[in-house]
């Protein structure tokens, strides 16, 4: 059967299901596609189709992720679901599957469990903007007071990780009942209600082109008679000929003006997110600019050395370290286009970090890098990736 072509007229949003093992993340994913297939907004993906997610390699890390897509009346969604807990950890930290929001699935029969807590913490650390809760398996709970208790517990847990626990929509239903065409009042109707809440509560992400201009510098050339050209792929925003920009990172921030933009050797009047461009910068010497710096809209990003991060450390099988590391570990941190050495401080009570662990840590770099919260990086030793991380907060 030919796949229906999705019309890209609706705003697009990336979401995923998170939560404890066996609480019903994959069943809910299947249930959403089943219900939306009735209105032509999806192709039904059965549980076992989603469950045998293919392995992908992102930044040298093996991650199993299932991708489904569907649309509601208001939006087009790309939805990720991971088979194993480790896959979630890797996915959220590497940003392999970007999440603009997530559906937290909690079994009403069990209440919040350790991975529920860990996924909420990860969502907070990696900057997932909003969560909606699906309280699943309500068909297994006879006592309405028990349901209320579980709901209160989930709200308190969300609040303890700085999510607005009192305001987050919680929809109660059963993914399994939906898949088995059972009672719609806890099945299909609840899945539709969930999607209405997701549409309304998860904010529409800003398109990269609407954000302040930023281009990581990959290379620098000197063109006789014209000046210095920096090249790279525009990460966000737009740059027009004549715009004032800053060169940020590694050294003191310098202001300059873009006097020319070219792409594939053709002159343009602007470059935008996704374009590989060369930008001619006025009055800048070739030796003043280097790979690893960024070209950015003035005042939109600042250079920093110290930050808190959430990181995943590769296993030996993934090509990572064979041994643990301790506080004062000094690897290289690869941001955008370059490596910078940094010193790691582990949190109190964490003696060491084993390959395969994920950890919150403090890092101090030897040179400042243009960064904002949510920036992803690789941890490397001599060019070999041994970990992946995300900046959760900037400390200096």
Curated annotation (Swiss-Prot):
GO-annotated molecular function: GTP binding; GTPase activity; guanosine tetraphosphate binding; translation elongation factor activity
Signal peptide region: none
EC number: 3.6.5.3
SUPFAM superfamilies to which the protein is assigned, alphabetical: EF-Tu/eEF-1alpha/eIF2-gamma C-terminal domain, P-loop containing nucleoside triphosphate hydrolases, Translation proteins
Main localization category: cytoplasm
Region (G1): 19-26
Catalytic activity: GTP + H2O = GDP + phosphate + H(+)
GO cellular component terms listed in the entry, alphabetical order: cytosol
Region feature (G2): 60-64
Region described as G3: 81-84
UniProt binding sites for Mg(2+): 26
Family: Belongs to the TRAFAC class translation factor GTPase superfamily. Classic translation factor GTPase family. EF-Tu/EF-1A subfamily.
PANTHER family tied to this protein: ELONGATION FACTOR TU, MITOCHONDRIAL, ELONGATION FACTOR TU-RELATED
Quaternary context: Monomer.
Protein name stated in the entry: Elongation factor Tu
Gene source species: Gluconobacter oxydans (strain 621H)
Encoding gene (name): tuf
